[in-house]
Amino acid sequence: RMEKKLTEIFGINHLLPTHQGRACEHIIAQHFVKPDSCVIMNYHFTTSKAHVTRLGGRVEELVKDEGLIVKSNLPFKGNIDLDKVKACIEREGADNIAFLRLEAGTNLIGGQPISYENMKEATELAKSYGITTVLDASLLQDNLYFIKTREDSMKNKTIPEITRMVADLFDMIYFSGRKFGFGRGGGILIRDEKLFHEMEDYVTMFEGFLTYGGMSVKEMEALIIGFEETMDLDIISQGPQFIK
C-alpha cells in the first residue's frame, strides 16, 4: 500500500523501504560513492555529507552565493549555481561525479527553497553528462508551497501536479518520513528497474526485508495518510511561518 501511494504521487514504481531518512543516504552512498569521487549538492545535510566522506568521497556544495546572504528577500535561496556545476563536472570529469543531489528545501540554511526551473536546468545539465540525479524530498512539502506561491509559472498548478513535475526530473527520490509523511520511516524511489534490483540487497543487509525495511505496519499505514496530507495545500500552508 505504501509503494502504491508513493507511485501515485511521484510516478515511480520501485520503492526501497528504510527505517528513516539517513538509512536512505547510507544505501545510496554505499552504491554510488567511491574513494575520491565527488557528489554535487546545492547544500548538504549533516548525515548526507557524512555518508559520502565516510566512504572517501567529497562533497561540492554549489548553492548560489546569494543564497547565503541572510538579509535578503530572494525567493529561492536554495538554488544551485549552474555555472559552478558545469565547471565542477568539467574539472572532475563526469565519470568521477557519483551523483547530483538536490535538497528541496535546504535544511541547514533555514529550509530555503529551490525553484522548479532551477531543478529542471540542473538535472538536464547532469543528465547531459550521464550523471545520476537524486532528490532529497524530506522537506518537499514546504518547497512545494513556495514553488506554487513564488514561481509565476506554477501559480495555477495544483500541489499534486507540481509534485509530479518535480519527480519527473529525477532518477531517484528519497525521503525521511518524519518530515515528508509525518511519521517514522523512509524510502528510496528508483526509476530504473535494473538499478532498483542492483540496490535491493542493501535493504536486506542493513534495514530488513524488502516488504517493510525496518518499519512496522502501523508506521507504514500512518505514512500513507501523511503522504496524502502532504498533497493538500490547506495542510502544507498551515505552518506559523506562512501566516501573515
What are these regions (language model features)?
Residues 2-244:
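Conserved PLP-enzyme active-site core in the AAT-like
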